[in-house]
Each structure stands twice: as structure tokens, then as C-alpha cells.
Curated annotation (Swiss-Prot):
It comes from Photobacterium profundum (strain SS9). It is an enzyme of class 3 (hydrolase). It is found in: Cytoplasm. This is Exodeoxyribonuclease 7 small subunit. One of its GO terms (molecular function) is exodeoxyribonuclease VII activity. InterPro entries: Exonuc_VII_S, Exonuc_VII_ssu_sf. Keywords: Cytoplasm, Exonuclease, Hydrolase, Nuclease. One of its GO terms (cellular component) is exodeoxyribonuclease VII complex. Its EC number is 3.1.11.6. Heterooligomer composed of large and small subunits. The gene is xseB.
Length: 80
């Protein structure tokens, strides 16, 4: 079965596959040619996931700007 194109995958599914690829590559028990294919797939997944995340952030900003009552505040990763 052919792998789904990253752009057709749900964000969470792409991250799960990317995590699996990272674990395989870190194990070191994979042939060079297979490792290169996995690395290439991982790069595609990472780029597509980043694009989807950026789009989601932009949607949130637009929704917050549409509500004049709600102030737009900076996102803080550490919840501080």
C-alpha cells in the first residue's frame, strides 16, 4: 500500500508517522537506502505539518481580530 501524501493526512496522523520515522532512524538498525527514503518522507511530513500549523494559527488570529471585544495577546508556550 502506498503511503498517503502528507498534504492529505490529518495533522495528528502526520505527527504520529513522523515520530515513528524518527524512532526508526534513531535506532540505527536500518539500511542506508531505507534511511534516506524515511528521512525524505520525514522532511515532507514535517514541512506539511508546519504549514498546517501556521494556517491554524492564522485562522485563530483572524477569529480573534474579528471579535472587537477580545484582545489579541501573544502566545506563551510556558503558560506564564
Amino acid at each position: 500500500m502506498a503511503a498517503k501524501k502528507p498534504e492529505n493526512m490529518a495533522f495528528e496522523a502526520a505527527l504520529d508517522e513522523l515520530d515513528s520515522i524518527v524512532n526508526e532512524l534513531e535506532s540505527g538498525d536500518i539500511a542506508l537506502e531505507d534511511a534516506l527514503k524515511k528521512f525524505e518522507r520525514g522532511i515532507m511530513l514535517a514541512r506539511t505539518s508546519q504549514k498546517k500549523l501556521t494556517q491554524a494559527e492564522q485562522r485563530v488570529e483572524i477569529l480573534l481580530q474579528a471579535d472587537d471585544e477580545a484582545p489579541l495577546t501573544e502566545f506563551n508556550e510556558n503558560n506564564e
